[in-house]
Design a protein with these regions (language model features):
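Mixed-charge, glycine-rich, non-catalytic linkers/tails in nucleic-acid processing enzymes
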Residues: 74-77, 119-175
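Short alpha-helical "patches" and their helix-cap loops
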Residues: 28-38, 103, 157-168
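Residue-level detector of short coil/turn "hinge" positions at structural boundaries
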Residues: 75, 110-111
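Exposed alpha-helical structural elements
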Residues: 41-45, 98-102, 114, 132, ...
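Conserved RNase H-like, two-metal-ion catalytic cores of nucleic-acid enzymes
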Residues: 1-98
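Short helix/loop capping segments that flank catalytic or ligand/cofactor-binding pockets
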Residues: 66-67, 97, 111-113, 146
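Short alpha-helix plus adjacent loop in nuclease-associated cores
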Residues: 79-109, 117-128, 132-133, 137, ...
Length: 175
C-alpha cells in the first residue's frame, strides 16, 4: 500500500494493445519497465502514455491507481479491472480472482513464481535482482493483457452482453 510509509514504489510496467482490431499508438507488444527512483522525464513520458490511452486495464486496479496517484500520475481515463470483470462474468458466484488463477483459467501466459520465491526467503520485491524484477513485471503486464482479451470475448457473447453496463459501473467505482 502506498499509505504505509515503509513501502515504496519500485517499478512501473505497461504495454499498449489494440482493442477490437483497432490499432493504437505504440502497439508493438513491448512491455515498458522503469525502476524507481524515476526521473521527471520518465514520469512525464508515462503520464503522456496514460493521457493517450482510451482506457487503462489493470488487475486489482485500486492498488495500481493508489500508487500512481502517490507518485503524481493523474489517471482520468476509464479503468477496466480484470478482477472486477471476472466477478461480473461469474455473476457474483465466488471464484478465485487472483491474476495467477485467472491466467490458469484462461490458459494465458502466467506470472512466474519469482516474487513468491523471494517472499518465501524473507525478501521483498525491491530485494529481487533487476533481471528478476523485469521478468516478474513483464509476466504481470502480459498476463493482465491476455486475461483482459479473453474476458472481452466472453462479454461479447449474447448471454453476457447485458453484463457490460454492470462491469462499467463497478469499474467506475474503482477509478
Amino acid at each position: 500500500s502506498p499509505y504505509n510509509k515503509d513501502n515504496t514504489l519500485v517499478a512501473i510496467g505497461y504495454t499498449y494493445r489494440a482493442l477490437d482490431g483497432r490499432p493504437i499508438w505504440g502497439s508493438d507488444g513491448a512491455v515498458y519497465i522503469k525502476k524507481f527512483p524515476i526521473d521527471n522525464y520518465y514520469l512525464y513520458e508515462f503520464q503522456e502514455a496514460i493521457n493517450e490511452a482510451t482506457y487503462i486495464v489493470a488487475h486489482n486496479a485500486k492498488f495500481d491507481l493508489a500508487w500512481l496517484r502517490e507518485v503524481g500520475i493523474e489517471c482520468n481515463n476509464k479503468v477496466i479491472d480484470t478482477m472486477i470483470n471476472e466477478y461480473v462474468l461469474n455473476k457474483g458466484i465466488r471464484s478465485k480472482l487472483s491474476l495467477d488463477a485467472l491466467s490458469e483459467k484462461y490458459k494465458v501466459i502466467r506470472k512466474q513464481s519469482l516474487l513468491g520465491d523471494a517472499l518465501s526467503k524473507g525478501l521483498n520485491y525491491s530485494d529481487m535482482s533487476e533481471e528478476d524484477q523485469k521478468k516478474y513485471l513483464y509476466y504481470d503486464v502480459m498476463s493482465t493483457a491476455e486475461v483482459f482479451e479473453k474476458q472481452q470475448k466472453r462479454f461479447k457473447r449474447s448471454e453476457n452482453k447485458s453484463l457490460i453496463p454492470i462491469r462499467d459501473l463497478m469499474c467506475e467505482f474503482c477509478s
